[in-house]
Amino acid sequence: LVINSRTLPRLPWVSLIAQKKAVILRDEQLVTSNFYDMRESGGQMQLRVNALGPGYVYLDGEAINTWEGHLPRLLFFFALDRPVVTRSEICQAFWPDLENDQAVNVFHVTKRRLHKALNFDVLVHDGGYYRVNPEVAVQHDITEFVGALVRGRMPETEDKASAWQKAIDLYRGPFLQGHSDQWIVERRAQYQQGYLEALSEMARIRLAEGRQEHALGLLLRAVGENDRYEPIHRQIMQLYADLGRRSEAAAHYQNLLDQLKQEGKTPEAETQTLYTAIIS
């Protein structure tokens, strides 16, 4: 299914692309950068935004530390999540339990604090929507991260290793680490999925080069990020077996089995079949 994103500007396209659930086309060409057509250079001000990890914002090279609480900062990250956003969507994400009038009042207070922290109106209202001020140049690590994922997936990309490695390098930690808002938790899982994909694909490349230990290190790194994604566990078990380290493959399976038992779960059938084949 191909959708013209101009008709649905309120969808979080970048996170959909990270999950391989969408692509953006322009004149039949796959878009691999600047998915929201934001100014990236030459603006009146230059913002550098790092959302992978704790979340930092830099204005003209200087870190912003005058947020007056976490809400103004998170409001800015939320505004970057999609091309445009409505006030109703903001209030629902941040203050779902407040009456509408109360939520609107808190929103305006938060927006004023955001503008005060950056010393200019970073959010502008246009046609019923809020969006990041088009006069501001924004460099966003999420855009760069997802762009690297797209290039790694493209069949025509010659140096896939560079694309996957760039995605790995840009992932400095979980999205807005330390926050537990529902929209943040959802995005965190989606971008983590892209990171696991990059690690897994990079491991495949290293295996093809005969660099098995390097590949194993990448896969173990993926498990350290998310120890519930069984396809990665199967890759690790198979690699241990290929290296002649069947006891380590069996131990890895037993660790996974113990973790799942604590949750009342069992390994996937494919994982159990692989384990049986390795120890037989």
For the regions a language model picked out, list residue spans one by one.
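Conserved AAA+ ATPase "SRH/arginine-finger" region at the nucleotide-binding site
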Residues: 23-33
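Structural recognition of the conserved hydrophobic beta-strand(s) that form the central parallel beta-sheet
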Residues: 1-6
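Short regulatory helix/loop adjacent to the ATP-binding pocket of P-loop NTPases
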Residues: 7-23
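Intrinsically disordered, charged and Pro/Gly-enriched terminal/linker segments
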Residues: 65, 80, 99-104, 127-280
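DNA major-groove recognition helices of helix-turn-helix
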Residues: 71-76, 90, 107-120, 132, ...
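Short boundary/linker motifs that mark transitions into or out of structured domains
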Residues: 31-71, 121-131, 173
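Short amphipathic alpha-helical recognition elements used for nucleic-acid or partner binding
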Residues: 62-94, 111-114, 231-236
